[in-house]
């Protein structure tokens, strides 16, 4: 009965708007970003709702990142690996190359922050099908999203 209104049937979309009102279509964007840096990026969560520019929380490809800095011991903590100049520079260069082809505000990546902790299935950051749950990641890591939009030196500024 249409008079009863609308019934929600399905999950809430991951898409959002930037502060400019421009829609960001997260699914395709995530795929494109990961593909552009697959050697060192396992997955990303796209942030930027109500912000001027997009940022990403980067879940690193640990093997690829370790390969970039072979001078670091194999048992060194991930935090040490992702803080290395080689990993930070490689990610910056790959994202800058991505931005050459994706320069609109809804696809251009302006900031990146590498994650030490992988997505947590117990915190619903991974779906039953093995995909990253964008909303859960951003909600659980709200402090890191805030850091992503700060002047913290760990944040990579991408041109």
Model-derived regions, located:
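Conserved C-terminal "lid"/linker of ANL adenylate-forming enzymes
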Residues: 16, 42-47, 92, 96-159
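AMP-binding/adenylate-forming catalytic core of the ANL superfamily
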Residues: 1-107, 121
